[in-house]
Design a protein with these regions (language model features):
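Extracellular glycan-modifying ectodomains
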Residues: 1-186, 191-198
Length: 198
């Protein structure tokens, strides 16, 4: 995904994590140094391929994510001009692996966590939530995940999903950096021009 973003934003340098766990990166001795040298910190995590719909595991996982985002905000609060892009959690795909009652409880828990993220982003202007759940609804559940990617590279998403996530991250970065694009409007019969000026 970073290769796609780097291709779109030419003047951007990306530092990849030394670890494959969010906790390890946040609590590493190099975290603050990396954060001070960065304008953006991108934290993505997904629940659908890891926890097999166990309510207690999902609850524990979401609590851990809550603590992670709070810790990141705490550790970066004295750093100027850093934006944290944090992925929300997509709702579960189906209830095949659990009871209907348990499935509904899990969905409510995930919705509550996503609301927590939105409220936290309102209080912390440097926290930007990337709505992965909305992307899943747009792309479709069947096209969103690719389990073989998870086993190959711990990336649960399909190629098309990676492209969409890259595009969304790029839009956020461009907006925050105020990157302007030139736009040529060809409107030979003046049907669009009034709306463009408005």
């Amino acid at each position: 995904t970073t290769e796609l973003i780097e291709g779109i934003i030419k003047a951007t340098k990306f530092i990849k994590s030394d670890y494959d766990q969010i906790d390890q990166e946040i609590f590493s001795s190099q975290f603050i140094k990396k954060a001070k040298n960065s304008q953006f910190l991108i934290i993505g995590s997904d629940i659908n391929t890891k926890l097999f719909y166990n309510y207690n595991l999902i609850n524990q996982y979401l609590e851990n994510l809550k603590n992670n985002v709070k810790e990141v905000l705490l550790r970066t609060n004295k750093i100027n001009n850093i934006n944290i892009i944090f992925f929300n959690v997509s709702l579960l795909i189906s209830s095949y692996y659990t009871s209907k009652n348990n499935f509904d409880k899990i969905q409510k828990k995930i919705k509550k966590f996503n609301e927590f993220l939105i409220n936290l982003s309102i209080k912390n202007k440097n926290l930007i939530i990337l709505d992965v759940d909305k992307l899943k609804n747009f792309i479709g559940s069947k096209n969103f995940y690719d389990i073989s990617n998870y086993y190959l590279s711990k990336t649960p998403y399909s190629e098309i999903t990676n492209n969409y996530i890259s595009f969304e991250v790029t839009k956020i970065i461009n907006a925050e950096l105020n990157i302007r694009k030139k736009c040529l409007i060809v409107d030979l019969d003046n049907t669009l021009w009034g709306g463009v000026l408005g």
